[in-house]
């Protein structure tokens, strides 16, 4: 199936203020010492995000579609109906405005994580303040190829998906808990008996 996606660009300016500490301990013949240094750290960065995808179909699980990333935009071509011959194609039912907020949430979270990762080498770090400013470009509407498989097991439905470009396969596999615990307990019992036997063998050899 061809799944509708909105692609978003953004130029980002971000600032962060962090409180950090470093603790040093040492001892002499009489006392134990602890030295705590406190730091106020400022971080600023500009970042550019290109073609952040958000699926435009409310019928599809956003988490599942995000797990299929990345998609390759380099081979994109202008749309022609002939490309859909023999395939299913979904049409977006979530507008670019709605999808924009989802994209910006991902961009903000990624920016915050990347900024925080620049604070290294301290024992404890706490964020005190920060701001993220976004300037979005015009969205692009695309169709990406995705293979979908729906199945059910023990009255529960499962959906699997595969990226039609890269072959990346995602989904939650059903788990037979009875079989799992039977297998686990069997292995545990075998290992227990094996260890017990080795201990007795070692004891009699002594």
Stretches with model-predicted labels:
Residues 193-206:
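Juxtamembrane boundary at the C-terminal end of a transmembrane helix
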Residues 173-188:
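Juxtamembrane/start-of-transmembrane alpha-helix segments at the extracytoplasmic/lumenal side
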Residues 9, 189-190:
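Short, well-ordered alpha-helical packing segments
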Residues 153-176:
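Juxtamembrane amphipathic/hinge helix adjacent to a transmembrane helix
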Residues 34, 175, 193-195:
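Alpha-helix boundary/capping detector
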Residues 1-157, 178, 203-206:
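Charged, low-complexity helical/coil segments in non-catalytic cytosolic or luminal regions
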